[in-house]
From Swiss-Prot:
Keyword rRNA-binding belongs to the record: no
Coiled-coil ranges per UniProt: none
Source species of the chain: Beijerinckia indica subsp. indica (strain ATCC 9039 / DSM 1715 / NCIMB 8712)
An example molecular function term from Gene Ontology annotations: NAD binding
Protein name (Swiss-Prot/TrEMBL): NADH-quinone oxidoreductase subunit D 2
Family: Belongs to the complex I 49 kDa subunit family.
General function of this protein: NDH-1 shuttles electrons from NADH, via FMN and iron-sulfur (Fe-S) centers, to quinones in the respiratory chain. The immediate electron acceptor for the enzyme in this species is believed to be ubiquinone. Couples the redox reaction to proton translocation (for every two electrons transferred, four hydrogen ions are translocated across the cytoplasmic membrane), and thus conserves the redox energy in a proton gradient.
InterPro entries named among the record's database cross-references: NADH_Q_OxRdtase_suD, NADH_UbQ_OxRdtase_49kDa_CS, NDH1_su_D/H, NiFe-Hase_large
Gene, per the UniProt record: nuoD2
EC number: 7.1.1.-
Length: 396
């Protein structure tokens, strides 16, 4: 049969596929086992989050952010709180800032642990998830002890955090740090120099720095291609400008470089956590956890039991909510997956006029056709794993 008699065939990758990382439906056009075209179909987890936020007070809108990147929920809350605080021109007390940074770095560990171990699982390594999830369980217990919830924390508030940390939690997080670094070394021993792991990741899903910028990449995806771009250093927020940490940068822009960067970022996160713990334990770190602006923050429970005015004020804040001055603002944080941004427009009322969410995974997923072109079908799993996508924030 001549060449014209052959044609490419199309297969569905997902949404049931275990390596699709959620509800991704990828329509692949294959020439034999070589990918000619990859067409992502998204929207299977769409809940209309941005529209729902327009019908909620600022406090009621906060829990929606936990459900975007549900692997590291507090990082998303952080961006929303920063946006509101910019419009209100509201400072955050020192202790509140340190607690926020501490739990954002715990979120980074949660996200990178899940990504590294499932990326290994996607290409056939079964041991890393068993080791990684043991550590994630400990971190989720820290989340639970601080906020009362393992995943959807709803812990950050405009002006600070909801409640102070319980006794002994700081000591327990400190005691977690050193053994965790040993687990990182063990994981790296399993994967970094493993011949099969390298064959499956090196020179797969390569993207140049110029191409990464053009496609709107951020986070690990641009650092893997050679740019030392991290919002915690480039545009410091909270107390990141006081903290000492390094930005790992790759050279080749492939799946293996992105894996190595996430591995090193976990060590840097532990370094940041230790500095936060030291500062929280010092005299400087003592004090209020939330700004005492009673137009925005509710009175303490002890006050409510004694004062009728405090009770009325609490009732007003939790029913009507607080008003935010008219204006528009963009606030972004360095989430584990990249630059997570919130573009907020206020009309001066108690509900947002518009809240646009900039999800890093969305920009990364749209490059799947470019990244997987002319690769083998088996490489698609490795590429999706290295993108670190979560469909809560892609579909919103």
């Amino acid at each position: 049969m001549d060449e014209a008699g052959f044609r490419n065939f199309t297969v569905n990758f997902g949404p049931q596929h275990p390596a699709a990382h959620g509800v991704l439906r990828l329509v692949l056009e294959l020439d034999g086992e070589v990918v000619e075209r990859a067409d992502p179909h998204i929207g299977l987890l769409h809940r209309g989050t941005e529209k729902l936020i327009e019908y909620r007070t600022y406090l009621q809108a906060l829990p929606y952010f936990d459900r975007l990147d549900y692997v590291a929920p507090m990082n998303q809350e952080h961006a929303f709180c920063l946006a509101i605080e910019k419009l209100l021109q509201m400072p955050v007390p020192r202790r509140g800032q340190l607690i926020r940074v501490l739990f954002c770095e715990i979120g980074r560990l949660l996200s990178h642990l899940l990504n590294i171990t499932t990326q290994a699982l996607d290409i056939g390594a079964l041991t890393p998830p068993l080791w990684g999830f043991e550590e994630r369980e400990k971190l989720m217990v820290f989340y639970e002890r601080a906020s009362g919830a393992r995943m959807h924390a709803n812990y950050f508030r405009v002006g600070g955090v909801h409640q102070d940390l319980p006794e002994k939690l700081l000591d327990d997080i400190w005691n977690f740090c050193e053994p965790f670094l040993k687990v990182c070394n063990d994981l790296e021993e399993l994967l970094s120099y493993n011949r099969i792991f390298k064959q499956r990741n090196v020179d797969v899903g390569v993207i140049s720095l110029d191409e990464a910028w053009t496609r709107g990449f951020s986070g690990v995806m641009v650092r893997g291609s050679g740019a030392a771009w991290d919002l915690r250093k480039a545009q410091p927020y909270e107390c990141y400008d006081e903290l000492q940490f390094d930005i790992p940068v790759g050279k080749h822009g492939d799946c293996y470089d992105r894996y190595l960067i996430r591995m090193e970022e976990m060590r840097q996160s532990v370094r940041i956590m230790k500095q936060c713990l030291e500062k929280l334990s010092s005299v400087d770190g003592k004090g209020p956890i939330i700004e005492q602006n009673h137009k925005v923050t509710p009175p303490r429970r002890s006050e409510m039991k004694r004062s009728m005015e405090a009770l009325i004020q609490h009732f007003k804040l939790y029913t009507e909510g607080h008003h935010v001055p008219a204006g528009e603002v963009y606030a972004a944080v360095e989430a584990p997956k990249g630059e997570f941004g919130v573009y907020l427009i206020s009309d001066g009322s108690n509900i947002p006029y518009r809240c646009k969410i900039r999800a890093p995974s969305f920009a990364h997923l749209q490059a799947i056709d470019f990244l997987s072109h002319k690769h083998m079908l088996a490489d698609v799993s490795a590429i999706i794993g290295s993108l670190d996508i979560v469909f809560g924030e892609i579909d919103r």
